[in-house]
Amino acid sequence: RDIQPQTVGKFCFLYRLTYMQNSQQNNKRIAKNTILLYVRMILVMGVTLYTSRIILRALGVSDYGIYNVVGGVVSMFGFINTSLGRASSRFITYALGKGDKEELQKIFNCVVTIHYLIALIVLVLAETIGLWFVTEKLVIPEGRETAAFWVYQSSVLAAFIMLASTPFNGLIIAHERMGAFAYISIFETLSKLLICFLLFIIPFDRLIVYSVLIVLTQTVVRLLYTFYCNKHFEESHYKLVWDKEKSKKIFAYAGWTMNGELAIVGYTQGLNILLNLFFGPVVNASRGIAVQVQGAVMQFFKNFQVAVRPQIIKSYAQGDFSYMHKLVLSCSRYSFYLMLIVSLPVLFQTEYILKLWLGTVPNHCVAFIQIMMFVGMNYTFNTPTTMALHATGNIKRFQIIEGTMLLSVVPVAYILLKYFHISPESVFITYFFIEIVTQIVRVIIIYPMVKMPISYYFTKVMWPIVKVCSLVWIPPLLVNISIPHQGFIKLIVMCIVCVLSTMVCVYVLGMNVSEREFMVKKVKAFKGKFWMK
């Protein structure tokens, strides 16, 4: 009552100024981390593609197949690590956003204890049921049983180390130290490249040597993550504790996340089996190639989303819903733009890219890839929306509904295949439409939970995207008509035109006024620095 209006005005001004400064710092951190993750992605992807050829040549087709099938038995436990990793990351990031160091220490200790416990359970299962399956059920070429055994044991040890050390990865991402994450990943990739060349020198069984060296590399990498955390983060010094209440929350969260991961495995493998039953293994091979291409293209927006995720959770923990809403909406739009800029050349030049990569293009592969590009574009909206949900920690109802909807594609596809004799391409189109409906349901459920109007999704995300998509395809189409013959020159021209077309359309139609002003300001600042040099 005694506070003067001038004082209130000054307080409001200082609050707005502080808020703007914090937002600018957070945006700069997101941009920096995104760039670091993209540099990591380009290097890792390039080296991985090269090492795949070297490994195949060094091991031979048979041993390479043994390594993949035996290691694949252990990789079935991968969804456990994914679910626990998401739970760890969410609770650590949330505690960090609250600014409670004591709570953060308790959460980290609890998370590490849970990971150690699950790692031991996986180890027991792998050395009993898993080992029995490998030795009794898998078809291993005669004389390679010992090598297969060592490959399996190395894979089990690698899985154990991965599970035990995942909380340290979550800590690095929660603190948004993407530089460390990128540099250690690059070290791991280059180490694997070195191993490939060592295989041609070491005079022992190459398959055994390769599996042992890979697990040694992963051990060193995990130790690097641990040492980095111990040096930079106080809360990373682990103490054995068991907090029943916190453990219950983390287990419940991880359990419902695991339900979602199992649903993904279910509909993915379910569709694969249906395609095999109705059309044979050739269609499975085409689908495998399409999924591989989609996965590579989707990395271009997933790195951006990894950089944004900690800020979404922290802003929710701090009660800053305005900034959180802005992040979710902006992340959805710009993830789509990143996917679009890479998808356009693939959509127009699918057949030539496949010929360049594989030599021979399998049947249905072109159509599969083109449909999966559209699935990937729709998927760009998924992660920012579910990031907001995971920030709340209230995921049970959503995971049940989402998992049921995604799994419904299997019985729907079966009915259409059995009674309406649809084509393999129609199976993918069915999957695409179910993904669209599921995304709409995600928005309807999640937006009210984080106090965001559902209309924002359509006015601030979908409408700018519709405007961009209405024009962005015209210049590439004109190039496609003007240069009728396929070739490398046409591919390069198409890539350049697609990038320029997307950039212009996004700037004119896909950005709001403040975003355009920010972009112009950054370009001018960059030009100023460049000309000064």
Label every model-predicted segment:
Residues 4, 15-30, 208-211, 225-269, ...:
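Interhelical loop/hinge segments that connect adjacent transmembrane helices in multipass membrane
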Residues 8-21, 447-458, 474-533:
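Membrane-proximal transmembrane or re-entrant/amphipathic helices at the cytosolic face
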Residues 32-49, 188, 213-230, 244-314, ...:
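Transmembrane helical elements of multi-pass membrane transporters/channels
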Residues 55-76, 107, 207-212, 246-253, ...:
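Interfacial/gating helices of multi-pass transporter permease domains
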Residues 56-58, 62-63, 179, 190-223, ...:
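Membrane-interface helix-loop junctions in multi-pass transport and translocation proteins
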Residues 82-98, 174, 233-234, 290, ...:
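Helix-loop junctions and terminal segments of transmembrane helices
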Residues 112-139, 198, 223, 325-380, ...:
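Alpha-helical transmembrane segments of multi-pass membrane transport and lipid-handling proteins
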Residues 157-187, 197, 208, 373-405, ...:
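Membrane-interface junctions at transmembrane-helix termini in multi-pass inner-membrane proteins
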